[in-house]
Amino acid sequence: MRDARRATAGATFAAGGRVEQVAWDPFVATTLVAGDETGGVVARAARAAAAPLWSLRAHGAAASAVCFSETAAGLLATASADASVKLWDCGGAPGPPAPVAARDLAVGELFALAFDAVDPLVLVAAGAGGSVALWDAAGDDGAAAAWLAAQGK
């Protein structure tokens, strides 16, 4: 990682494999996550080269997409070449996030993922063969509970 405002290189760190995607936590501006080709996801403090904040094996195949909800603090989504999308609660105790919900979207390997800008529990993912799938996770009790907790309810 390099801070473009400085002439010298910033903090660098290794992931578990080739990095597929990175995302900033919109509620903790110095935290970023990276998903890698092994299915691992690692969180780091951007200004420190120390040990990761946490890491986990999120998927059985490449963690091809990672993104944070911009409306529900601590809600992370990951998508994978294993065709699944998983939601994680990063807002709790230190250490790896707790799993919240998972869904196989039945569109093959997944390559892109995003939260809806208005509804914090609706996600869209793009898969192999040009397929796009929507998942309204509000019907999943774990996802709904995580969102309510993020809202302080």
Q: What feature does the model see in each segment?
A:
Residues 6, 13-19, 49, 56-63, ...:
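WD40/WD-repeat beta-propeller blade N-cap
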Residues 23-29, 66-73, 79, 114-120:
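Loop/turn segments within WD40 beta-propeller blades
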Residues 31, 40-42, 84-86, 131:
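A conserved positional marker within WD40/Gbeta-like beta-propeller blades
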Residues 62, 72, 84, 90-153:
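Terminal intrinsically disordered, low-complexity extensions flanking WD-repeat/beta-propeller proteins
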Residues 4, 35-38, 78-82, 126-129:
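Conserved strand-to-loop turn within each blade of WD40 beta-propeller repeats
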Residues 40-44, 49, 53-55:
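Detector for outer-membrane/organellar transmembrane beta-barrel domains
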Residues 4-7, 46-49, 90-93, 138-140:
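Short loop/turn segments that connect beta-strands within beta-propeller blades
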